[in-house]
């Protein structure tokens, strides 16, 4: 399995598949926000940023999957998935165990050199409450679904990182 994951990490297909899944999730988030009129909270926006990190890592990996640039993509992927797990876990706990003392910020805080909420307010401005339950599917709230998705991204990222020393076997069908 590790040899297979190493082989996949050196091809564009797996990286593009990951980019497609992250882009589909981002578009779904925008659908919820602009069509279903659900208000994203601060943690939702940070979770979006983590998902954009996974998307960016996938695009970097797809550019040059056989070069050391793929290792940069894997580190970004691992970090983004880990931060996504942290954020969605915190968000899930805020929704499952609401407390007047445990709240999220009122505004998204981006660095001054990267004010995404000013540049693209349709995507990065938060207007909802983190503890408010707005949507569920099969009994799970949106942060719980995202927690599962980020855990899956993280597990696969760890396995792909572990697989890097395992070189793919050369298949010689007609040799002895």
Swiss-Prot record:
One of its GO terms (biological process) is protein folding. Pfam families: DsbB. One of its GO terms (molecular function) is protein-disulfide reductase activity. It is found in: Cell inner membrane. Its main location: membrane. Disulfide bonds join 41-44, 104-130. One of its GO terms (cellular component) is plasma membrane. Gene3D superfamilies: DsbB-like. It is a multi-pass membrane protein. The chain crosses the membrane at residues 15-31, 50-65, 72-89, 145-163. InterPro entries: DiS_bond_form_DsbB/BdbC, Disulphide_bond_form_DsbB, DsbB, DsbB-like_sf. Keywords: Cell inner membrane, Cell membrane, Chaperone, Disulfide bond, Electron transport, Membrane, Oxidoreductase, Redox-active center, Transmembrane, Transmembrane helix, Transport. Residues 32-49, 90-144 are periplasmic. Residues 1-14, 66-71, 164-176 are cytoplasmic. Required for disulfide bond formation in some periplasmic proteins. Acts by oxidizing the DsbA protein. PANTHER family: DISULFIDE BOND FORMATION PROTEIN B (PTHR36570:SF2). This is Disulfide bond formation protein B. It comes from Shigella sonnei (strain Ss046). The gene is dsbB.
């Amino acid at each position: 399995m590790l040899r297979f994951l190493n082989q996949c990490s050196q091809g564009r297909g797996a990286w593009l598949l990951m980019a497609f899944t992250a882009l589909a999730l981002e578009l779904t988030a925008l659908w919820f926000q602009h069509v279903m009129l659900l208000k994203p909270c601060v943690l939702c926006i940070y979770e979006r940023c983590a998902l954009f990190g996974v998307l960016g890592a996938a695009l970097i990996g797809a550019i040059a999957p056989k070069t050391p640039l793929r290792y940069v993509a894997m580190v970004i992927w691992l970090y983004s998935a880990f931060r996504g797990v942290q954020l969605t876990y915190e968000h899930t706990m805020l929704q499952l165990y609401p407390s007047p003392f445990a709240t999220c910020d009122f505004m998204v805080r981006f660095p001054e050199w990267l004010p995404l909420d000013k540049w693209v307010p349709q995507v990065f401005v938060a207007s909802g409450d983190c503890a408010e339950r707005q949507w569920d599917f099969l009994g799970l709230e949106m942060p719980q679904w995202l927690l599962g998705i980020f855990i899956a991204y993280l597990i696969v990222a760890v396995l792909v990182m572990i697989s890097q020393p395992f070189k793919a076997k050369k298949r010689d069908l007609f040799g002895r």
